[in-house]
């Protein structure tokens, strides 16, 4: 229990520092971009809430079944959790492409074209990659439940390094487009070790 708590605390710390590095880069782009990004992030956090809920559920589910030696049930549970979160992702992609300006206005109360345009751009681009963070949440928590506290932290370390590089490299070259692409790039890199480790354990 202590190891699991320590591992989760380490993951959250790495995620926080990675997000902070991106925010520092965003703050250099001016007020309209800051407002747009803040609004888009709030909407994204709402869109991704089921991923977190499913992740917590899978940590408990996998822990119980690993203790009982029922790996077949873990495989089935992970598969079903991925399907459910991917179905949700499809819905959020559809919502991003049909209602982004309205959602952004709802959050900001702003009709500034630059705010609406950049925030919509963010949502439409990042939502196409929601399958990756859905898998990250499910697999990372499943591995925690199965007793692997190293791989999830390693995955979070990739997030930290990736966001720092994107903040100081992509953002300088591509401006806000670099920020928009930062998370999809990092998500794909993060999910790779989680998939490999899960397949090895099961």
Predicted region positions:
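Short alpha-helical transmembrane segments in multi-pass integral membrane proteins
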Residues: 1-6, 62-129, 170-202
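Hydrophobic faces of transmembrane alpha-helices in multi-pass small-molecule transporters and flippases
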Residues: 1-21, 26, 46-50, 54, ...
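General structural feature for long, well-ordered alpha-helical segments within catalytic domains
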Residues: 2-9, 13, 17-22, 33-35, ...
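Structural signal for membrane-spanning alpha-helices in multi-pass inner-membrane proteins
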Residues: 23, 49-52, 96, 141, ...
């Amino acid at each position: 229990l202590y190891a699991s708590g320590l591992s989760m605390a380490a993951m959250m710390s790495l995620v926080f520092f990675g997000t902070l590095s991106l925010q520092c880069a965003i703050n250099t782009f001016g007020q309209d971009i800051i407002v747009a990004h803040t609004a888009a992030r709030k909407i994204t956090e709402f869109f991704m809430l089921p991923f977190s809920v499913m992740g917590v559920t899978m940590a408990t589910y996998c822990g119980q079944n690993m203790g009982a030696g029922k790996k077949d049930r873990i495989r089935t549970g992970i598969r079903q959790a991925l399907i459910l979160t991917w179905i949700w992702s499809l819905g959020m992609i559809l919502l991003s492409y049909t209602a982004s300006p309205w959602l952004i206005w709802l959050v900001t109360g702003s009709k500034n074209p630059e705010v609406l345009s950049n925030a919509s751009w963010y949502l439409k681009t990042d939502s196409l990659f929601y399958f990756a963070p859905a898998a990250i949440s499910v697999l990372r928590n499943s591995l925690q439940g199965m007793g692997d506290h190293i791989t999830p932290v390693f995955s979070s370390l990739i997030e930290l390094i990736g966001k720092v590089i994107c903040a100081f490299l992509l953002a300088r070259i591509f401006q806000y487009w670099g920020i928009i692409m930062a998370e999809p790039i990092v998500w794909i890199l993060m999910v790779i070790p989680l998939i490999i480790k899960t397949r090895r354990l099961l």
